[in-house]
Regions:
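A glycine-rich, Thr/Ser-enriched phosphate-binding loop motif common to dinucleotide/cofactor-binding enzymes
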Residues: 75-92
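Adenosine-phosphate binding glycine-rich loop
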Residues: 10-12, 17-23, 31, 179-235
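Glycine-rich phosphate/diphosphate-binding loop of Rossmann-like nucleotide-binding domains
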Residues: 97-162
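Rossmann-like adenosine-cofactor binding region
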Residues: 151-201
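Short hydrophobic beta-strand segments
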Residues: 1-8, 55-59, 104-113, 132-136, ...
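Metallocofactor- and cofactor-centric catalytic cores in central/energy metabolism, strongly enriched
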Residues: 5-66
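Short acidic, S/G/P-rich loop/turn micro-motifs used as interaction or catalytic elements
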Residues: 33-37, 63-66, 112-117, 139-140, ...
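Structural alpha-beta junctions
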Residues: 20-25, 48-56, 68-78, 124-136, ...
């Protein structure tokens, strides 16, 4: 069961639990006493949600009390699997933000092995970028051969001597990445320079966008193709 922690409003003294649906996703909404978050109020709300079977929760953007929620047995909704499924849109958003046309771009894919998400990213990117650098020790050569047969020359073995505009990391970075780095590894990738939303329509504002999209995607309520990605770099 997934929960949703939100402020409850002025004058409320008790935790209030309400079943709700957000874009077809059933949630147990935990309304924190009062109009704002405090550590004590969040602990009370998290404890109540956990007693009702909740193990992971959504919360507003920049929610400051994950430690208090974790102490009661709650964790954020995992976003890593969705981020890896969105690797190609993330790459194209990064190139667009940097003003680099995909047909002129070299993009590196790095990982310990060829996973389904890495393979799908390669198949999506290879036809549209100038060069795709596949830097994967386990299964990388077989993937490069598949891409060469289907698309021709763009897929090659990467390495320190080959420049890249962007490196997509499907496993933790090892210090050999070039250009911009999008670390998609782990359960909760940190992608503060990217924005995620619906290609059509709007998300509710009382839950952080990426975890909500991930919960919807995991539940089969939307597809990766219905998610829009943009990038906003400071430098």
């Amino acid at each position: 069961m997934t929960g949703h922690i939100v402020p409850g409003g002025e004058g409320r003294l008790l935790v209030r639990l309400v079943r709700e649906q957000v874009l077809g996703l059933p949630l147990l909404r935990g309304e924190v006493p009062g109009s704002g978050f405090t550590a004590r109020r969040v602990r009370r709300t998290a404890r109540a949600l956990r007693r009702h079977g909740v193990t992971r929760v959504l919360a507003p953007e920049d929610f400051p009390f994950w430690g208090e929620a974790a102490a009661q047995g709650l964790r954020p909704v995992e976003t890593g699997e969705l981020c890896r499924a969105l690797a190609a849109p993330i790459a194209l958003a990064a190139l667009e933000a940097d003003g680099v046309p995909p047909r002129l771009a070299a993009v590196a894919l790095r990982g310990d092995r060829v996973t389904r998400s890495l393979r799908e990213a390669a198949l999506e990117l290879c036809p549209v970028v100038r060069q795709l650098l596949v830097e994967v020790p386990a299964g990388g050569e077989a993937l490069r051969q598949t891409l060469r047969r289907e698309f021709g020359l763009p897929a090659v073995e990467g390495g320190p001597g080959r420049p890249a505009h962007l490196t997509l990391c499907f496993s933790p970075p090892g210090g050999m990445e070039r250009g911009r780095i999008a670390d998609l590894s782990g359960d909760w990738p940190a992608l503060p320079e990217y924005r995620f939303g619906l290609a059509e329509g709007a998300l509710p504002e009382d839950a952080a966008a990426l975890p909500l999209l991930s919960a919807l995607w995991q539940a089969g309520r939307l597809t990766a193709e219905s998610i829009a990605v943009t990038a906003h770099f400071r430098t």
